């Protein structure tokens, strides 16, 4: 991939560019962009201190497709990694189509005025990306994403058969605060208050938020 543009300078964006800098043989040229460039500069300073790698920074309002297109043309990346808010997914996908650049995100699109989990908005882009010869890798955060890689590795290298697979997503850390989230607080609250969905009896079953519990050892 070599040259990559990361949009979004929150907690996830910070972790991502630090990890990219640790793998400079793959990500040899990194640009971090956000609406507030001061956040990008602070992260870039941390990356330099921790890894010795210099990353570029830029300002962009990802709600503005034309501005995002202009930045992509200026940077010339092979891949745009969208770590901004889910509200901006479609705008950034439009910008990637306009510039002929591959796309990756970690969270599915949601409209600003409605907390609704729905893949269809982004899946509707499939033909356009395919016809343009471009990749759009969606939802490759932790669940799914990292957990899928873990499960595939276990299946391929460690176990002969798998009967069931339970994925427990929790945070064992302590921020020392009464309330702290792992990523954008608004999105986090949307997720935990949304109707729950689980796979049971060969189909998806939906229920009220926080209506199911499971004990584990």
Enumerate the language-model features and the residues they cover.
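Conserved N-terminal Rossmann-fold NAD(P)-binding element of oxidoreductases
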Residues: 4-11
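Rossmann-fold cofactor-recognition segment
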Residues: 49-64
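Helix N-cap at the beta1-alpha1 junction of Rossmann-like dinucleotide-binding domains, i.e.
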Residues: 36-39
């Amino acid at each position: 991939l070599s040259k990559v543009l990361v949009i979004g300078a929150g907690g996830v964006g910070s972790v991502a560019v630090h990890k990219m800098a640790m793998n400079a043989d793959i990500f040899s040229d990194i640009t971090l962009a956000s609406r507030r460039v001061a956040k990008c500069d602070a992260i870039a300073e941390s990356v330099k201190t921790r890894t010795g790698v210099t990353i570029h920074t830029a300002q962009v309002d990802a709600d503005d497709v034309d501005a995002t297109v202009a930045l992509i043309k200026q940077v010339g990346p092979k891949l745009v990694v969208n770590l901004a808010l889910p509200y901006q997914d479609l705008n950034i996908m439009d910008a990637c189509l306009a510039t002929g650049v591959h796309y990756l995100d970690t969270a599915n699109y949601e409209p600003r005025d409605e907390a609704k989990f729905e893949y269809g908005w982004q899946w509707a882009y499939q033909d356009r990306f395919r016809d343009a010869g471009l990749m759009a890798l969606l939802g490759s955060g932790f669940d799914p994403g990292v957990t899928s890689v873990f499960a595939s590795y276990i299946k391929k290298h460690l176990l002969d058969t798998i009967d069931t697979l339970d994925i427990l997503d929790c945070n064992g850390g302590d921020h020392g605060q009464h309330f702290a989230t792992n990523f954008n607080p608004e999105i986090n609250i949307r997720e935990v208050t949304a109707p729950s969905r689980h796979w049971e009896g060969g189909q998806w079953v939906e229920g009220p938020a926080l209506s199911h519990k499971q004990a584990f050892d």
